[in-house]
């Protein structure tokens, strides 16, 4: 049983957290005790809870630019006595820099460093530090990476390019459909940059179709095609990036989840 702290209104989402397809993917691919789960976009620790519930002995390394969310996640780790956890109060990008995180609420899960994706949408800003993964954590053995950064996927992946090539982890990554007509071309261009980078790393792309917290189906694709946002978009905006040398094993395990609808 996980203890959920409430701090200045934060914590409710963790209290109502339900099992979903990501839990099953973690069970299949991330239970490697001598390697690390990298969580890019910790927010208030939703994936931290999922991971530590399933893999209590495996190391966890999280990155989160929102200082309020980091303070909450540290408290979550403390009250539950989660072992082997490090949270870096920084964004991941292509290098060390000072960036602006736009948000509306203190723990806004939609907060983004890419302001052009949601023009004039956010009400608040926070100056944050960014760093590239490779410079600081290249030697760290990775088994699995989760990326949820509201548009900053390319910078995250580019900044950990050498680590991805060396350690060959699986990557679950959200790539959102275009939230406004005016930014559809911009959003597609950024998604295409991600695809080109993955291709250069010898990685394949699988689009996941999820519904009601379950994995319904999946499709091996060459390109991520961005559409205008609809109510169905959340069911098709999650992807699995994987080394092509592991393709047969990855496809076989994913098929087992679809068969069981986990």
Identify what each model region corresponds to:
Residues 42, 92-94, 133, 149, ...:
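Hydrophobic pocket-lining residues within nucleotide cofactor-binding pockets
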Residues 1-132, 138, ...:
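S-adenosyl-L-methionine
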Residues 168-176:
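Conserved beta-strand signature within the Rossmann-like core of class I S-adenosyl-L-methionine
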Residues 88-90, 203-212:
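Conserved S-adenosyl-L-methionine
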Residues 130, 188-201:
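Short alpha-helix
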Residues 13-38, 98-100, 114-167, 179-186:
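Short internal loop-to-helix segment that lines adenine-nucleotide cofactor pockets
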């Amino acid at each position: 049983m996980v203890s959920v702290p409430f701090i200045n209104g934060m914590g409710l989402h963790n209290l109502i957290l339900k099992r979903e397809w990501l839990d099953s993917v973690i069970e299949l691919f991330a239970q490697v005790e001598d390697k690390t789960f990298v969580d890019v976009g910790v927010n208030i620790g939703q994936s931290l809870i999922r991971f530590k519930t399933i893999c209590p002995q495996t190391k966890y390394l999280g990155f989160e630019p929102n200082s309020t969310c980091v303070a909450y996640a540290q408290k979550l780790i403390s009250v539950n006595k989660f072992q082997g956890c490090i949270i870096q109060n920084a964004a991941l990008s292509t290098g060390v820099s000072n960036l602006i995180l736009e948000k509306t609420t203190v723990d806004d899960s939609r907060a983004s460093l890419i302001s052009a994706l949601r023009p004039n949408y956010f009400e608040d800003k926070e100056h944050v530090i960014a760093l590239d993964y490779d410079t600081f954590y290249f030697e760290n053995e990775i088994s699995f990476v989760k990326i949820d950064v509201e548009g900053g996927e390319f910078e995250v992946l580019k900044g950990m390019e050498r680590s991805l090539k060396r350690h060959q982890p699986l990557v679950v990554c959200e790539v959102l459909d275009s939230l406004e007509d005016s930014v559809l071309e911009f959003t597609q261009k950024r998604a295409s940059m991600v695809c080109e980078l993955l291709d250069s790393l010898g990685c394949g792309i699988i689009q996941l179709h999820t519904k009601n917290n379950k994995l319904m189906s999946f499709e091996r694709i060459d390109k991520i095609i961005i559409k205008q946002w609809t109510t169905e978009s959340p069911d098709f905006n999650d992807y699995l990036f994987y080394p092509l040398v592991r393709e047969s094993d990855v496809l076989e395990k994913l098929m087992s989840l679809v068969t069981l609808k986990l």
